[in-house]
Amino acid sequence: MIGWLLDTNVIAALINRNGAPSVKNWAATQDETCMFLSILTLGEYDKGIENLPPDDPNRYVYGAARDALEERFSGRVLSLTDNCVRRWGAISGRVKLATSHAPPVIDTMLAATAIEHDLYLVTRNVKDTRFSGAAVFDPWSDDPARFPLSGK
């Protein structure tokens, strides 16, 4: 694997001053240029902002945080390509067949994106991605030494 695709729950832990120490410690040891976001993560921020009442002062705070995140990851925000979407379809079908439950769309889209770009998927949602075929790293509980980067 050449890098890390960060799920929204990882970003939340990193930017929250009370976020999980294990997540913060792991991230502090990584080369940030090897960290990527999916456009879906920015979309999840947009969804959260739009769920707030129009006069909620947090709309501005969360909007500024979302914009700062997009700027910080400039050039490292991955779009959904045709290959990612086709891989997502295959993953979703296999996971549903294996578990008898339809997997969460965003989690399996992230898994497909990670596979397409040779990245570890960094998430706490291991249960939702375990049959995806993606290499999944949970910074809340996994040993980082078991997830080496191979270089670009």
Predicted regions and their residues:
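Residues that scaffold the ATP/ADP-binding catalytic core of kinase and kinase-like folds
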Residues: 13-14, 48, 88-91, 132, ...
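Active-site neighborhoods of divalent-metal-dependent phosphate/nucleic-acid chemistry enzymes
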Residues: 47-52, 71-120, 150-152
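Short secondary-structure boundary/capping segments
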Residues: 2, 26-29, 68-69, 77, ...
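Acidic, PIN/NYN-like endoribonuclease modules and their adjacent C-terminal/linker elements
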Residues: 109-111, 115-152
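Alpha-helix capping/helix-boundary segments
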Residues: 10-11, 41, 84, 110, ...
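Short, well-structured N-terminal submotif of metal-dependent ribonuclease cores
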Residues: 1-41, 50-68, 143-150
